Amino acid sequence: MNSQYALVVFSGGMDSTTALLWARREFSGVSAVSFFYGAKHNARELAAANVICRKLNIPRLEIPLDFIGKYFHSSLLKTGGAIPEGAYNETNMASTVVPFRNGIMLAAAAGLAEDSGYSAVILGNHTGDHAIYPDCRPEFIDGMARAIGTGTGGKVKLLSPFCNMTKGQIAALGAELGVDFSLTWSCYNGREKHCGKCGTCRERRDAFREAGLPDPTVYED
């Protein structure tokens, strides 16, 4: 176990919850940071994040990034159009890109980590994100890792432990770590239940199927 502390960028979804428990296993201490940026599903995912962190007794800070919802354009945001239904791929999900979202969040997380004396920031991106979101790709992670390391004088490093894993592999790891997936939230629509039709719901279903795990999610359809 690493004797240092880690800060996990935590949305309350499958990947970041697995990252949270992975960090708890790998580091002496772990905290979570969540961001409210005006997404349609922010209220649902942050409610999930709160429940999960309270259950695990992990400290969590919530930081508002209201300017994103006010000035940026994306169907993921409350100010944007409808969330596309269907496959989780580049063509279908292009409208859900929020410009440089992860860069903004990671910059804030890195500053918070340095100020708190933490040695690492952890992001739970995976291979399925690469084609859709430029700020989830390995080259972006490498660039941000260099920027964070340089900008904090080597005090903070960026870790992306799942960057070369599929969501199904993450689900399998999460099950090994004891993740209660029934508490996690994925759906971009942010209604009472997972819609079951948007790309993230489709990807969620596929991940459980790939991992050979029962899907505990309650879907609308």
Where do the PLM segments sit?
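Immediate flanking context of iron-sulfur cluster ligation sites
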Residues: 175-196
